């Protein structure tokens, strides 16, 4: 199986690194294209894959093509490569807001397409990726794509109408989490903790809390209640968060993200 990556930025690099680390595809069977020769050489040195500046070469030589350029570049790049794609290939799109119908229309001929939405924790092998196979993709082919996506984290298949919501919860929410960690650390610093230790405690607390929820399968509300002793300091702090609409504000942020993604 030969894989192609058109655009080899951070996200493509994370996907490639995960695939190689898991031994799913060898580096010499992975092709990547960059906009400049300098970037192509850097990608080759970093990942050991074959690189070029020719997008059409990658499209023509690959069984599965990952389109990893910026959303605003999609139309131009698709116009460039569409005549080099054939109906047996799978095109994997990682751009938010680009629907299967939009992609199919721009390609202009029958094409197997999988729409995916990874997030930045993929860079450390802990990504969350929602994916939606098009009608021409067989269950066996969808399984192959899922296995590739699972090389750098969790992969969840969804119906396409849910992809923008998944993009908000998975793709944009790391920014919310980083803000929360920063705010926790700021509170610790305000109470005398050194910055480095405050950030470490906050980050590990978020990591441990998430792991506990995933491993126990408990509802987050139940786990929250277990920490809140009657009349204790934790329930007092939860009350303060609720006074400032912590959950409501987060929910509105997710919905704002979805609205923006749909407008791209």
Each language-model region and where it sits:
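NAD(P)+-binding Rossmann beta1-loop-alpha1 motif at the extreme N-terminus of oxidoreductases
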Residues: 1-53, 60, 126-127, 189-190
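Short pre-catalytic strand/loop immediately N-terminal to key active-site residues, enriched for Gly-Thr
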Residues: 114, 163-168, 220-225
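Rossmann-like NAD(P)(H) cofactor-binding subdomain of soluble oxidoreductases
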Residues: 37, 46-47, 55-60, 64-131, ...
């Amino acid at each position: 199986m030969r894989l192609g990556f058109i655009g080899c930025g951070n996200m493509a690099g994370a996907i490639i690194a995960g695939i190689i680390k898991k031994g799913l595809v060898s580096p010499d069977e992975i092709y990547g294209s960059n906009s400049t020769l300098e970037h192509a050489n850097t990608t080759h040195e970093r990942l050991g894959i074959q690189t070029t500046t020719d997008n059409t070469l990658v499209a023509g030589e690959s069984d599965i093509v990952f389109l990893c350029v910026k959303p605003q570049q999609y139309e131009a790049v698709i116009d460039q490569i569409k005549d080099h794609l054939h109906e047996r290939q799978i095109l994997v799109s990682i751009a938010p807001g680009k629907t299967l119908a939009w992609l199919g229309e721009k390609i202009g001929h029958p094409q197997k397409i999988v729409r995916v939405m990874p997030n930045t924790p993929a860079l450390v092998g802990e990504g969350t990726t929602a994916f939606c196979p098009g009608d021409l993709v067989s269950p066996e082919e969808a399984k192959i794509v899922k296995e590739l996506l699972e090389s750098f984290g969790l992969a969840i298949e969804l119906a396409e109408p849910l992809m923008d919501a998944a993009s908000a919860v998975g793709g944009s929410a790391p920014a919310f989490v980083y803000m929360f960690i920063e705010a926790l650390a700021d509170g610790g610093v305000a109470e005398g903790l050194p910055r480095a230790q405050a950030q470490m405690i906050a980050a590990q607390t978020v990591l441990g809390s998430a792991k506990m929820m995933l491993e126990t399968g408990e509802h987050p509300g139940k786990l929250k209640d277990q920490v809140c002793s009657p009349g204790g300091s934790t329930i007092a702090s939860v009350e303060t968060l609720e006074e400032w609409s912590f959950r409501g504000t987060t929910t509105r942020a997710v919905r704002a993200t979805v609205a923006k993604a749909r407008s791209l």
